Amino acid sequence: MASGIRYDSIFLGIKFGMSQKDFYTHCWELNKQGLILQGPSNLSVQYRLDTTLMRSDTYMWFYPDFQDGELNRMPVEFSYLAWAPWNPMLSSDSLLMDVKQLLERWYGSEFIYLENKDKTKKLWVMVMGNRRIRLFIKNASTVGADITDLYRVKNEN
């Protein structure tokens, strides 16, 4: 952030600083183009990544957080469509590496690996200017990503 360089682009034309109205309007347009759908229980946006981007068809679900009326954080979840407990090739460990490579291609930078002393918390982090991306395993089938605008964040957990 000391460089003063800003990276407001998140993905699919969604940007930090968008109002809720602009976000909904943009998603409505993406939906009309057939690029996105409503996610589970209508609580998220669903985007399907195909095998040209991932090892297996993958769902990406997202819904932003807004602070002072502006998009400041984008929590994202990824899961292979064909995931099953008996299919180790599609475990969250494999998915994590797929998502890591995808995001490195999208954002043009690399992640660094971090863990706490007792190795109970492990994640990959990428910071470019104001945009921080944290990547982690949520459970056996799901990888989480948290894309945050460090200029707009006030209170973090």
Go through each PLM region and give its residues.
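Non-cytosolic coordination micro-motifs
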Residues: M1-P40, F78-N157
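Acidic helix-start/capping segments at beta-turn-to-alpha-helix junctions
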Residues: L37-L49
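Short acidic-hydrophobic surface loop/beta-edge motif
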Residues: Y47-T51, W124-M126
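Short, cysteine-centered beta-strand-loop-beta hairpins and adjacent loop/turn segments enriched
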Residues: T52-S56, A82-P85
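Short, surface-exposed coil-to-beta transition loops
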Residues: R55-W61, T120
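Hydrophobic/aromatic beta-strand elements that line small-molecule binding cavities or substrate pockets
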Residues: M60-D65, L135
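A short, structured loop/turn motif at beta-sheet edges
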Residues: D65-N72, W106-Y107
